[in-house]
């Protein structure tokens, strides 16, 4: 039973990163240099407050926040086609086809609901935006009925693609003090 509980927690953690990608994937030297040069996310995820980016045009702010809301709603509804419509076709943090396969498997094995608070556009450029949110996740592994609660901070990176904002990568830091597993 402990092994199944551990597996449930491990799978949940991996899915929390949903679009973070395959760590075995090799990136080119140019891409690696760009990541180092640009930084992984454009602000500090640790600490108290995340400041709202001041340079966001009103129309883009509405569109970005609507895209984030749809991304979370699609995950919570566990609707794979709807979820994949929120994902970039050319993501930086994962492979599109692998994400679809993986998300389908997770949707089949878990009932996961995400509650988000303090949603803030923390960094903005005309073609990329970083959305910060505090997140609480409630999951149930369907086969074992093992429940898990977790909380953390997530940055969802969006890119402008075909005049819409799509998820290109996700960064998550869990808060172990707010996590629990039980039946």
How should these model regions be labeled?
Residues 1-5:
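Positively charged n-region of N-terminal signal peptides that target proteins for export
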Residues 6-12:
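Sec-dependent N-terminal signal peptides
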Residues 16-19:
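C-terminal motif of bacterial Sec signal peptides marking the signal peptidase cleavage site
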Residues 21-73, 77:
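Short, low-complexity N-terminal intrinsically disordered segments enriched in polar/charged residues
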Residues 52, 68, 100-102, 114-120, ...:
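Short structured motifs
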Residues 74-94:
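Short, well-ordered alpha-helical segments enriched in acidic and aromatic residues
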Residues 104-146:
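Surface-exposed, charged secondary-structure patches
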Residues 128-183:
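Exposed beta-sheet edge and beta->alpha loop/turn motif
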């Amino acid at each position: 039973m402990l092994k199944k509980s551990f597996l449930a927690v491990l799978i949940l953690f991996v899915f929390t990163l949903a679009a973070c990608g395959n760590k075995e994937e090799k990136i080119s030297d140019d891409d690696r240099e760009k990541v180092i040069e640009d930084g992984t996310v454009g602000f500090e995820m640790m600490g108290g407050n995340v400041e709202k980016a001041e340079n966001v045009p009103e129309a883009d702010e509405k569109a970005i926040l609507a895209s984030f809301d749809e991304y979370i709603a699609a995950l919570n509804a566990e609707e794979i086609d709807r979820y994949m419509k929120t994902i970039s076709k050319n993501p930086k943090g994962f492979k599109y086809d692998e994400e679809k396969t993986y998300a389908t498997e997770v949707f089949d094995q878990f009932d996961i609901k995400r509650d988000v608070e303090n949603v803030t556009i923390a960094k903005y450029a005309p073609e990329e935006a970083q959305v910060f949110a505090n997140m609480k996740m409630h999951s149930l592994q369907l086969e074992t009925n093992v429940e898990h609660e977790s909380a953390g901070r997530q940055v969802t990176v969006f890119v402008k693609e075909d005049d819409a904002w799509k998820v290109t990568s996700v960064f998550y830091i869990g808060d172990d003090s707010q996590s629990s597993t039980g039946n």
